[in-house]
Amino acid sequence: MKTAHEVRPGNVIMFEGSPWVVQKTETTRSGRNAAIVKLKLKNLLLNSGTETTFKGEDKIDDIILDRLDCTYSYFADPMYVFMDAEYNQYDVEAENLGDAAAYIVDGMEETCQVTFYDGKAISVEMPTTIVREVIYTEPSARGDTSGKVMKPATITGGGTISVADFVKVGDKIEIDTRTGEFKKRV
């Protein structure tokens, strides 16, 4: 168990009978009152979010989840199938992938981390950066070069992100999977 003060982003806690990952913490202190810790949480089973507050000394159950490095194998509607180094396969429901679904493509070489709770695969964490090909974007607008000009682009996997104006169809780009932002052309 941890106190609310000790909880950090990335920790997984048990809250209202479900595992939640802490996305953000904010501590406020007032003159005579005890510190208040505000947590932004994401439910790992339902893929929903909430914010809640605790007193600084409140006890919180922290849990350690099993994580395995896996590679994407194939899609069997509605499950994405991942395989570990020992050729064990794990099914992850499409709704549990969240934003990661936009970056998953057949034949991808990146290794993902699959998270387990009670022996069941519940989420997938993509690598921090990935390289994908642009399959559709509008041509650049001539003369529109003042400042940082961005335009929408569709990448392999079906996701849409904002890219720099100079990016063309067929270009390979690096993407930050935590924010979904274009980093550079590769």
From Swiss-Prot:
Top-level taxon: Bacteria
Main location: cytoplasm
GO molecular function terms noted in the UniProt entry: translation elongation factor activity
This protein's record includes keyword Methyltransferase: no
One GO process term, biological-process aspect: peptide biosynthetic process
Coiled coil residues, start to end: none
UniProt key word Protein biosynthesis: yes
Subcellular compartments: Cytoplasm
Pathway(s) annotated for this protein in UniProt: Protein biosynthesis; polypeptide chain elongation
Carbohydrate attachment residues: 32
Family: Belongs to the elongation factor P family.
HAMAP family (alphabetical): EF_P
Protein name in UniProt: Elongation factor P
Organism: Shewanella oneidensis (strain ATCC 700550 / JCM 31522 / CIP 106686 / LMG 19005 / NCIMB 14063 / MR-1)
Name of the gene: efp
